[in-house]
């Protein structure tokens, strides 16, 4: 019986791993069965229904960084070129050709697709490879024996390994229930409506791409001033030259850097930075201002939301209070959002493997080459937390082909090797 890899979420990472597994299976290579457990649908976080976008905004990375990119597989000796060639059947270009839109895309200057179009591409790949999707919201993650159990309201999925993807839920809010404070999902729901947002003073919390896409949307609404609140001293622009981009698609030299050097690189290229496109729009709009600080407290008072900002200046901590008519919490997801799903026994297993209490820093530093938490059995793949140890491209869309290599090449999926005298057409294993 084949081992099973369960993926929490049916987004780009799930589709990329499933696509490569499908191609390897066609090549006669033993691979796990990939099952995605998803509450909405394939690529939902790129659609309005997922709560993270209205679907109309543009993808922040090149669509050619698709499910097989960078097409540099290293899984099957002497057959990796064949594997890469087969993976091109599920490339962005192949999708455009299949939907009779390749020439138009080229003629328009190869524009970044909308989030909705990107989700349609992911759904196209998932449909062609026959990705198995179990529809339901995972309410509990537990370890039973040597397997994972993903429990939804309707069913329980058993698997030999688990990969958790996605940013979690977009419904997080500073003041739940207060109409003057919008979560990410509430903002996009309002933005998608016919009525424009109408407010004098608006605050957007966050300095990353989630907040940036919200600012891009707010430009067309009736707001007098927009204040961006983030801990950084200013709003940094993401580096998008060759040297920055190569960090994402080729992590070969990443391990040679110290943790401090890696954190510095991530801060300059990935986390808490705006794209050059958004920065250009900010430059042209005099309604935009920036406040440095972290939100320590929020309260509704006299028709406003009062935010207490905490700012470190040298060795001293200062607090200031600011009033806004509308606050949008675009600070993004909690990196440990999924830990609330773990059973107590599972948390104990994780802390035993980590050698201490479960924290974001400790978990990130424990991600190994295969993008799984080291010293934890059964395997738990956490690609969204792998940037620090493995390279900045793995948590996002920048090297999905390398990601699938790392996951499918993990030791748990390597069956007993067959005799090297196997005939053509017999199954072979990795390496």
UniProtKB/Swiss-Prot annotation:
Originating organism: Mycobacterium tuberculosis (strain ATCC 25618 / H37Rv)
Keywords, sorted A to Z: FAD, Flavoprotein, Monooxygenase, NADP, Oxidoreductase, Signal
Endpoints of the signal sequence: 1-21
Family note: Belongs to the lysine N(6)-hydroxylase/L-ornithine N(5)-oxygenase family.
S-S bonds: none
Protein role: Flavoprotein monooxygenase required for N-hydroxylation of the two acylated lysine residues during mycobactin assembly, thus producing the hydroxamate groups necessary for iron sequestration. Is also able, but less efficiently, to hydroxylate L-lysine (non acylated) in vitro. Shows 5-fold preference for using acetylated lysine over lysine.
Gene induction: Induced by iron starvation conditions and during infection of human THP-1 macrophages. Transcriptionally repressed by ideR and iron.
InterPro entries: FAD/NAD-bd_sf, Lys/Orn_oxygenase
Classification of source organism: Bacteria, Bacillati, Actinomycetota, Actinomycetes, Mycobacteriales
Name of protein: L-lysine N6-monooxygenase MbtG
EC number: 1.14.13.59
Pathway: Siderophore biosynthesis; mycobactin biosynthesis
Pfam families linked to this entry: Lys_Orn_oxgnase
């Amino acid at each position: 019986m084949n081992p099973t890899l369960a993926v929490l979420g049916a987004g780009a990472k799930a589709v990329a791993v499933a696509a490569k597994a499908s191609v390897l299976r066609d090549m006669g290579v033993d691979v796990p069965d990939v099952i995605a457990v998803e509450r909405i649908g394939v690529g939902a976080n790129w659609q309005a229904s997922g709560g993270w976008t209205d679907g109309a905004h543009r993808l922040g990375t090149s669509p050619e960084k698709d499910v097989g990119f960078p097409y540099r597989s290293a899984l099957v000796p002497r057959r990796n070129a064949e594997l890469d060639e087969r993976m091109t059947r599920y490339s962005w270009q192949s999708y455009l050709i299949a939907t009779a839109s390749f020439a138009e895309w080229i003629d328009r200057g190869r524009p970044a697709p909308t989030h909705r179009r990107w989700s349609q591409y992911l759904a196209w790949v998932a449909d062609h490879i026959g990705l198995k999707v179990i529809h339901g919201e995972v309410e509990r993650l537990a370890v039973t024996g040597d397997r994972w159990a993903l429990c939804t309201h309707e069913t329980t999925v058993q698997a030999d390994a688990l990969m958790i993807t996605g940013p979690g839920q977009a419904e997080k809010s500073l003041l739940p229930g207060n109409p003057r404070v919008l979560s990410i999902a509430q903002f996009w729901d309002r933005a998608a409506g016919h009525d424009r947002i109408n407010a004098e003073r608006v605050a957007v919390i966050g300095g990353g791409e989630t907040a940036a896409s919200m600012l891009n949307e707010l430009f067309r609404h009736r707001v007098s001033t927009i204040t961006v609140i983030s801990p950084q001293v200013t709003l940094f622009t993401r580096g998008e030259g060759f040297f920055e981009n190569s960090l994402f698609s080729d992590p070969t030299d990443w391990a040679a850097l110290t943790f401090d050097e890696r954190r510095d690189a991530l801060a300059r290229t990935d986390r808490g930075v705006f794209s050059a496109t958004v920065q250009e729009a900010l430059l042209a709009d005099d309604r935009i201002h920036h406040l440095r600080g972290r939100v320590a407290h929020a309260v509704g008072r006299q028709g406003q939301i009062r935010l207490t900002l905490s700012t470190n200046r040298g060795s001293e901590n200062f607090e200031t209070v600011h009033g806004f008519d509308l606050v949008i919490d675009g600070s993004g997801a909690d990196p440990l959002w999924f830990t609330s799903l773990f059973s107590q026994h599972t948390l104990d297993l994780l802390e035993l493997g980590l050698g201490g209490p479960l924290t974001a820093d400790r978990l990130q530093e424990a991600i190994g080459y295969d993008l799984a938490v080291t010293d934890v059995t059964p395997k738990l793949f956490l690609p969204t937390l792998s940037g620090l140890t493995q390279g900045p491209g793995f948590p996002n869309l920048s090297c999905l082909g390398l990601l699938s290599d790392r996951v499918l090449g993990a030791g748990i999926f390597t069956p007993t090797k067959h005799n090297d005298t196997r005939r053509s057409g017999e199954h072979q294993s990795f390496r």
